[in-house]
Amino acid sequence: MSGEDRGAPYRYAGERPPAYPADGYASYQRGLKSSIPSRSYDTAYPEQGYDRHLRERVHPAYTTGPSYGVPPPPPTDYRRPPPQAAYRYEEDYHHRRAPAQPHLEYAPEHRRQPVHSDAYREADDRRSFEQARSDPYASPSRHAYQDSYRSELPHERRHAPAAYERISVRDDARSAPENRHIDEPAVYRRDEYDAHSREIQPSYRRGAHRSPRLSPQPVVSAHERSSEYATRDYSASAARYAEPVHQPESPPRPSMSIFNMLNDRSANGAVESVHSSPTKSSIAAEHESYPTTAQEPSHASRAAFDPAREQSYSTARDSQAYSRGSEARAGAARVNYTVHPEDEAAISQRRNSSAHQQSSIKSVRHPANAVDEPLIRVKHEEATSASLDAQMSAEPPVSHTLNNGERLSAQDAKVATEDSSLAANGNGKVDSAGGTARPAPAKTQLKLRNNPLPASKSNSSFVAPPPPAKKNRDPDGWESDLSNEENQPFWQTELDDYIFDVRERQRLIEDAFVASMREKHVEVERRLARAYEGRYFAVIRQIRLREQQEASQRDMERRQDHVRQQRDHEIDLELLGTLSDGQQNMGTRKKKGGRGTDDDGLLQADDDDDDDSDDVALADLAARNGSKSNIIKLKRSKGKPAAADPRNKKRRLENGAALSPAPGSEVDSTLADFGGNFDGDDSAFASHQASPTPDDVSFALDVDASGKVPIDARRAQQLEDAHRRIWTTIAKRDVPKVYRTVLQSASSKTMYWRRISSVVQREAKRGAARNNKTVKDVQLRARKVMREVLVFWKRNEKEERELRKKAEREALEKAKKEEEMREAKRQARKLNFLISQTELYSHFVGSKLKTAEAEESEETAGSSKIIDPNAQPSDATVLPINPHSELADAEARLAELDDIDFDDEDESNLRAHAARNAQEAVRLAKEKAQAFDVAAAEERRRNEAAAREREGLDAGPVKQIEEKDLGKAFDSDDMNFLNPTSMGQTEIKQPKMLTCQLKEYQLKGLNWLANLYEQGINGILADEMGLGKTVQSISLMAYLAEVHDIWGPFLVIAPASTLHNWQQEISKFVPTLKALPYWGNVKDRAVLRKFWNRKQISYNRDAPFHVLVTSYQLVVSDEKYFQRVKWQYMILDEAQAIKSSSSIRWKTLLGFNCRNRLLLTGTPVQNSMQELWALLHFIMPSLFDSHDEFSEWFSKDIESHAEQKGTLNEHQLRRLHMILKPFMLRRIKKNVQNELGDKIEIDVFCDLSARQKMLYRGLRANISVAELMDRATSNDEAGLKSLMNLVMQFRKVCNHPELFERADVRAPFALADFARSGSLAREGDLLNLPDSTTSLIELQVPKLLVREGGIFDIPGHNSRKGFDTGYLQNLFNIWRAPHIHESLQEERSTFASLPLIGVSPSEAQKTFHSTGIKRILAAAAEERHWRSLEAFASDDTFAAASVRPLAKMLRPMPTTSGRSPSVLMPLEEVAADYRRHSYLAKDSARAVVAPAVAPPIKLYSNDGPFMQAQERFSRDAQVSVTLFGLSPEGRESVKRVEELQSELPEVPPQGVMRDSSIDQLPYNGMQVPQMNKLIVDSSKLAKLDVLLRELKANGHRVLIYFQMTRMIDLMEEYLIYRQYKYLRLDGASKISDRRDMVTDWQTKPELFIFLLSTRAGGLGINLTAADTVIFYDHDWNPSNDSQAMDRAHRLGQTKQVTVYRLITKGTIDERIVRLARNKKEVQDIVVGTKAYSETGMAKPQEIVSLLLDDDELAESMLRKKQAEEAQTAQEKADLARASHAKRRLNKDRAAAAVESPAPVGSTWSLEDDEDDFFGARPPSKADTDTAETTPQLQSKKRSVGGGGGGSGGAKRGRISEVASPRMTPLSLDDGALMASGEQLASPSKGAAAKRKSKSHRKKTVDELAGVDLD
């Protein structure tokens, strides 16, 4: 595993020094920058493999490497980057063992031989020396033998952490697999490893303490580095390592690693320490684990230099035993480093001469000069595998220049530098010239003053004591007892010994290095020699194999010829009779298919098979080569090829099998030797065959003296038989065969001749075609020209046709536009005619009604100031009409009017018709009213006459009076419209029967209403709410009854909430009029209909009723009954209820038979102009008959202005006001009512609570802006409903989160049975059921378990078992009074709290031994007793204070508690106070509710005593009475109370639980939502809570309006919690309840709040007792809110009215209020002067504007606009590109037509590379296939067949019946690629085809002519 995988390795930040190939490790030379790149192991040895599963190197038999010190050429395999060093903690791997090496365990014998190079061992010595010198406790890398690594800087290595060790970190993931890890060898240590550890000890002792770990220092000079060991600070030690157990008091020693290594070396013996190689010590040391505490003191040091350990590790690692387990590795090898006798002299000589160092270094580069150098031979006790050094990568060494010009390697230079530096630090003990060293003096043991050295258990001279605790040291780093001058003689001698040992060790290192280098070079030379030899013989092997193959081929050919000759000779001899019997028999056997014993017997062939000789040759070759079993007989069919013969089941032997040498041959053996020595050669010749030997066949025939072969009779018979068989065979087999052959030959010749003839014919035709080519080309060209001309004229005709169509289309569009303009003008004239007619009618009526005078408001009077009457109208408007001039002109031309023609531009005729139609309308209205009056009078007369006849009276005079009165009242002369102001001058006084006094503006309203009635015109009384529209309507009915003697019937239709108000006010103000309330259920209404449904009823003063009051709902349901009656006046209160012209209510009321209609509304225009038209059409159907025309004239411009899309046309607004004024009267409060108090509106903004924010953000996150915009642009009803649903969800969040889900009561599931009663009414008001729950589970217990000795008799924790004997009761009881008394005498008594609570020892004993109920009773009695004495006990002046216990004493003390700032509560009340006031102690703080609860399981058994005991235990009457007290009936009984007092004198009648605190009661498991949480969760409710407190304190009365009834439910819970008195009125309230609630509110001042819904409680009712109105949420129709607030701000209100609006800031609530205020201004446009309008809520765009913020809406609209613009631009660009392509195409066509050469008779010749008539090449088949893809360039040279893939023999010139699908560029039109007889190209591929058509390619005449060449 790499360093990155293992953890956080320490990496060098600077440049890493290169790795050198001398020893596989890296050496650092200061100031040296090598240009040789470092390479990994695989780079140095690319032929070696890497086994990732074993995580080890797989060693080949031989490798290549540098030889003779010459660096090898850099290899080409750079599969791995250079390795990188990192540190690891050695303690991390103390439990791991060294990795096994199975490849060494199962390797061949020659690969398991130890190959230890002296050069490698010397490098290991030097590396171990460097590591030991820097830090004796830093072990080398355990896996240095696997990968080469780079050495760190000396100062970094010296100051590295002690427990760090270095491993190779590969940057390449392929070279460092993930499953690779660092293994730790097993902990093993032998005594011989530590026997030398105390040989040469200095004055200080070696211990387990480590040298201080210093931070990295900057690089110092060579001199400073070499001498820095004398100035290091050794005052600190690593505290992380434990001290040895057997060395507790040894002084600390400085961390000089060379001393430790010398001590280890000296402890191993003189001979072994001098001549031991340090190569193995570093490896052994890195696999050594730290010693345990159980080891001896000699084992404390583990990181010092130990050659024996190192060699043992190396030996154990390379052995088979080491790879098989740690047990075998512990004693795997024992290495004895001794000096060979013949090398002792050389070593001694080299020890005394320092100059020998350079000569040894030279030997590295010149091995020939180092032959005489002595070698250190290592004696192994056991054979091991190749050492680590043989596996390291080989790099060319970096050399340094010596003084004499020689070049040294980097390792030699460093060794030389270190030798010189060490020698320089020897204080003169070493000769400066490097000569012989002074012999070391005798070692003197230092006698320390404090700690004498104990005897060592090893063979060393002394054993140092363990280090003591840390002491202070002087600034030089040495301890004071050694650095003094008086102790210098003790350590000076050892210092001299150390210097001498350094020199000795340096020489040893040099000797080992030279020997290892020499051995390494020899080994490398041997490996290279074998490698080159293997490569050479591989080449020779191939050459020999090739020569053998050639020789075998020649030999085979020779043998085949020989065999063929032999067979021919045998046939001749046989025919001649010279063949012997033996030979004849052999031949017969061969012919029969038998096999002979010789070589030829292996083959079987027919006699006449021509290829038998080949088989014989193969058999002979196989027999001679020893591979007869490999021969496969190939039978050839007779007269047919071998592949067609089904009997040919054997294939021929491959030629390669015969060419390869036979296995086991000489050549094969020779080549196999190379294969065994060279594993890297993977030859294809796995097995070799021997070369065949020549075939030697001789024939021996017997001849006579004359040379003839003698033939006897037998021989003659044989020959005759042979001849017969031969001829028979020939006749039977060969003759048919020859016949077939002859036939086949004849047929083959025929076919061949035919083929020849066809070829000759084709060649002849080709020549003829070449001659006739000119004529053919002329014809083709003429045909092409004709076709192209035809295409041109077709295209021309098409273009002309398109131009004609385009001109016709433009003409039609122009005519259509002109017709539209004429129609628009016609419609404008028609609309102007209708408006003019309406204006004239309004002017005639208004002059009589005096509406302007009746209003008397600034708003109406100032209209002429704001709107300039002289302003010029726009193009779509007409000049103002002068009614007088128009009427005069109409009278003058009345008889000569032409028909109405709206196409005539002269509008004078239209104005005349408008005036006449207006006059006619007035006349018709008058006639209708007169007819109604006449009919009503006649009916009244008949009814009265019938009544008088019944009474016996004369009706004649009365009839005359009525007719006279009618003539006076309705004189036709008074209704002359030519003088419209004649009737408006009459002033009407207040009727006398009206009991109230009308105000001035109300009296003017009465005059206006009377004029409407007298003119027979309907009207709208649109006074602002609260100005007395109801009383004005009642006064009108009184006026008609008093003046005109019209007593009805009058129909008043009002909302259900105002029906009682109408009835009360009619009875109050006009008692003479009889009001009939018509509401109730079906039966009630049937009874009421008897009063007004009678046939003969006279509506006079004595009529059963005069006014019928009902609601809109009942009118619709009882429509048929209302239509039977002719109503004199129909008054609609709150007329906005019929604002929808499509509703059933509007249509039903429009069909009623009535003389006049009066609409009462405070908001004539609410949402749209359509509602205004609905009201106008209701009062004047003849004028406002078309809603489309009305909307065309007014609605569009006004609503577009409201949407801020344009400016309002002031002329249109003025004309609208002119039309409405005669029919509508509107006054506002501020202008007509001065005594009414002001109305103040205050907006209260609230922030969302935490819960509301969470819900609001969740809803916003689930909304897609794009989806909202799509829904806004669509007119889908489902989308609109979805948007409205979203709006409601957001409004719920703003109002209260509980509207989504109520926080209901949480309680566990109770698995129990509760008490039941038969009837609650029978039980009375009080039902006491304490302890009534029982378990639903009954467990039947056997008798054996319940009887004595059973399971239920086992003592429990509350059992009293054992107390009957007295021992537990007396001896072992601590609650005995004597024991308590004795314990109180002690200092820390257990019962010290008893005196504080006033309990004596006897009382404590009594309480302990009493039962639980007695304890409860005693505590309750004590509590009651002190409660009665509490007032006296707390005062010291009373005697009761002397007996109070200490726990109840009160001492005034200052405290920080806000509840009791100066009093410290008694001790006994601390817990109770915590339970009462701490939130954590309450039940509401419980976060977990049990899922289920149940009482104890009920046990049942057949044992009677057991059941009785269970019943007593669960139903103890005494316990029940004590806890719950007497029943309510028992408490009233004196006798029962006395019995309880006598039985339980300390128990009160109500029980002890009644007096207990609630926090002491058991937890019931039920969680009830806190009302405080209900208030806090909603910001509006929290703000309302504060506001209501202030209003309640100031004596205000409040109306609170809501939009949702569920919110009213939550508000009721809040009011109950705050204990406010309130009323509630919503749509579900009954009519009678509404009347009573309004009455109670007006008469009962103790009622504080009235909860109302905006729709139900805001219409018509009088709630002037309230002076404050609060809107909890808002309606987007501002009229509803205005009506709601006017319930309090109306006539009769004497206080100032304050309106509060609770608005949630930054939410949909705020946007609804803003939109409603915009809609509120619509009245100023319709009936006022402000130029602003409203918008309806039905538009999806407005709903989206509520859901989104302004920024989001603007951004989404901007993105949508940008997308539309981008799409439009893209379409324009596509159109421009298409037109541009078309122009370019036409241009290219014209250029091609101009540049193409004209045809000249017979000189035309169309070759493959020649241009056609228009200079383009025809498309090939490949082009046709790729026409829809990217165009590709076509080569000029193409095949005759018209395609790159056609064959050369394809036919040419054949004309196809179907034209080519590929068309010429002339066939393209508008960028589309069209083909003759083919479908159009797809639109998506037109661009590619278009680009393809532009390529100018040559076309053949055939393709231009539409022929297909194949």
Swiss-Prot record:
It holds the Pfam family DBINO. Its main location: nucleus. Keywords: Activator, ATP-binding, Coiled coil, DNA damage, DNA repair, DNA-binding, Hydrolase, Nucleotide-binding, Nucleus, Transcription, Transcription regulation. Transmembrane segments: none annotated. ATP binds at D1023, E1024, M1025, G1026, L1027, G1028, K1029, T1030. The keyword Ubl conjugation does not apply. It catalyses: ATP + H2O = ADP + phosphate + H(+). Residues 49-59, 118-133, 167-199, 222-231, 374-383, 548-572 have a biased composition (Basic and acidic residues). Residues 1888-1899 have a biased composition (Basic residues). Residues 257-266, 311-320, 349-362 have a biased composition (Polar residues). One of its GO terms (biological process) is CENP-A containing chromatin assembly. Residues 1010-1182 form the Helicase ATP-binding domain. SUPFAM superfamilies: P-loop containing nucleoside triphosphate hydrolases. Residues 69-84 have a biased composition (Pro residues). A motif (DEAQ box) lies at residues 1133-1136. Residues 1840-1850 have a biased composition (Gly residues). GO terms for cellular component: Ino80 complex. Its EC number is 3.6.4.-. Residues 321-334 have a biased composition (Low complexity). Residues 1-487, 548-611, 630-673, 852-878, 1760-1910 are annotated as: Disordered. Residues 726-851 form the DBINO domain. Residues 1583-1747 form the Helicase C-terminal domain. PANTHER family: CHROMATIN-REMODELING ATPASE INO80 (PTHR45685:SF2), HELICASE SRCAP-RELATED (PTHR45685). ATPase component of the INO80 complex which remodels chromatin by shifting nucleosomes and is involved in DNA repair. Belongs to the SNF2/RAD54 helicase family. This is Chromatin-remodeling ATPase INO80. It comes from Mycosarcoma maydis. The lineage of its organism: Eukaryota, Fungi, Dikarya, Basidiomycota, Ustilaginomycotina.
